[in-house]
Amino acid sequence: MVKFSKELEAQLIPEWKEAFVNYCLLKKQIKKIKTSRKPKPASHYPIGHHSDFGRSLFDPVRKLARTFSDKLFSNSEKPEILQVRRRRGSSETGDDVDEIYQTELVQLFSEEDEVKVFFARLDEELNKVNQFHKPKETEFLERGEILKKQLETLAELKQILSDRKKRNLSGSNSHRSFSSSVRNSDFSAGSPGELSEIQSETSRTDEIIEALERNGVSFINSATRSKTKGGKPKMSLRVDIPDAVAGAEGGIARSIATAMSVLWEELVNNPRSDFTNWKNIQSAEKKIRSAFVELYRGLGLLKTYSSLNMIAFTKIMKKFDKVAGQNASSTYLKVVKRSQFISSDKVVRLMDEVESIFTKHFANNDRKKAMKFLKPHQTKDSHMVTFFVGLFTGCFISLFVIYIILAHLSGIFTSSDQVSYLETVYPVFSVFALLSLHMFMYGCNLYMWKNTRINYTFIFEFAPNTALRYRDAFLMGTTFMTSVVAAMVIHLILRASGFSASQVDTIPGILLLIFICVLICPFNTFYRPTRFCFIRILRKIVCSPFYKVLMVDFFMGDQLTSQIPLLRHLETTGCYFLAQSFKTHEYNTCKNGRYYREFAYLISFLPYFWRAMQCVRRWWDESNPDHLINMGKYVSAMVAAGVRITYARENNDLWLTMVLVSSVVATIYQLYWDFVKDWGLLNPKSKNPWLRDNLVLRNKNFYYLSIALNLVLRVAWIETIMRFRVSPVQSHLLDFFLASLEVIRRGHWNFYRVENEHLNNVGQFRAVKTVPLPFLDRDSDG
């Protein structure tokens, strides 16, 4: 049977862990009570009380007598063992705050210090739970009211657009707004009268906007004026994210409802913008739907919070009764049940209301469909996945041993064949090997995050029912590696069987083509949600300045900075097959080309450039100067990478000095950011020396070892300036080994980066995502 302390640890919300009942602390206090209580002489107890300590032959008789006396006398005549008083607390400003509970002991326990300490801590835990629950409940209730207003606004907008569409289909000629005439008129030859009319109509539009804002309705980027390519002025009024052209005819409306209706009517009065408006409405609807899902999730977490804490109080009081030999739980639990976090039913009622609203507006009155959105069920771990992981791991090891034997027997690495083999096979197979290693490290990250209760799905904003799990990551990695080694074995067998080199050397290209087809396959096979999510993130990284940067975006950007050798191998592979060098076996066609050599700089710069642009975008959105400082880290890395490439081609003392200077500066920059910013370590004032106050791993030595390991792997670039004289095969293997070390370092870095982000969420009790709403209410926005 699982102990409740472990069950509580497994079920509690990680981000709210500090707000839960400290069950372990109370349990330790009960153990202290048990050890401190010793048998006392009978004279120390009140008349009529029998000691519970010691055994005798008369115990059954005494028990029967106590039972008979309990039935004989009414319970009202029994004195209370304890009394829990409730009072109003006060803040520093003197205002009343939450209710405070305080237990007063009477009779037996008034003389026992350990019992006093226990109930004092129990009161603290009860007050802590109430003080956390009430603000959270208020926050969710206010969020629910805002979402209902947003939904009403959305419904009215949809109705106006629908009515407008019906009028257009029926052939009725609706009156065009002033903004439509502005777009259709030629202002290059406009008269002063036309300009004055424009100004008067514009002022009327501004008056309507001001009137609406005075009554609490705000428009995002209201009354923004711009010019089209033809020089025609245009007014953009945004209620949502749409750039809809606005105008108004007549004076200010008599009421806010009328003004809103007039303004919305004008927003959709242009037939040309019907498609755009519907698209914007759909975008707003998607945001509101996501907000309702997050609200329901938050309410569910708060409900779980209440129930788990109630169970914890019940369990701990039963333990106390067992140790003390008294029935103190009934009195205290009555108070707990009357406290705010249990007695309030607002959360449950709001959950029911959200279910009905979501079913009606977003699921076509299909409750089953609605609950799939509100309560997505995560698929259970399949033993079949574990079986295939083991199967492919065994296949990979067997095929790799076969490959080594065949390579030795065929003499593929002799001086006559090694250049041909390395130029055709090494780049493509290295791509898959590095990718598989990265996937394996990511699987290790997922395993560690799960075991340490780090909520990575919330941090990365993954859907819980489609998020990749560690077994799936291991399956993908072992599948890739088995396929790669199988292709290498087939390549050697066909090469030794007398097939033409041009035919055999197409095998790596075929393998790469299969991988690309699997990646973009539209069918729901082989983890389609994960594949498409990966493609979307890559698109956002490539266009990083133009997209809002989320945690998962810059996390993936950091992964790319560790895969520059993989990108260089892709460059070589692309040139090799596009130039059809596999037919002529002229391997130096690419390497000696000027464009190929210059493209190497671009490939090495791109991951750092994308990451720097993400920092710029985050600085633009958040106005945090730390993002600009972080951008400097990637700029220094770009400089160091470019200097190293040049030094590999221009081997002289000048470039050696530049490599040393640029690499040392970049490494110090990166190490500081790794330890202080990304990991949150090296805090001299921390209670854990040179670490941080909160640690997920219990053994502090892991953090010190990780700091040392990251330091060693960060300076692996020193190999590039040592000028080892090795053969081409050894040189390629050394490059692959260093690239693998960087992938391992990145996987090691990933755990502590996400751990630090998780602890930031814990410190702010952030367990629910805040979805930005489409319609801005000035009063609610503050």
Curated annotation (Swiss-Prot):
Induction: Up-regulated by sucrose and Pi deficiency in roots. Down-regulated by auxin, cytokinin and abscisic acid (ABA). Up-regulated in leaves following treatment with ABA. Down-regulated by the transcription factors WRKY6 and WRKY42.
Site (Important for inositol polyphosphate binding): 23, 27
Main location: Golgi
Residue intervals on the Lumenal side: 408-423, 495-506, 615-619
Recorded topology in the membrane: Multi-pass membrane protein
Presence of the UniProt keyword Membrane in the record: yes
EXS domain boundaries: 591-782
Keyword annotations: Endoplasmic reticulum, Golgi apparatus, Membrane, Phosphate transport, Transmembrane, Transmembrane helix, Transport
Known outcome of mutating residue 318 to A: In KSC; decreased Pi content and reduced growth
Effect of residue 322 to A: In KSC; decreased Pi content and reduced growth
GO biological process: cellular response to phosphate starvation; intracellular phosphate ion homeostasis; phosphate ion transport; polyphosphate biosynthetic process
Skewed-composition ranges (Low complexity): 170-188
Comment block on domains: The EXS domain is essential for Pi efflux out of cells and is necessary for the endomembrane localization. The SPX domain provides a basic binding surface for inositol polyphosphate signaling molecules.
Name assigned to this protein: Phosphate transporter PHO1
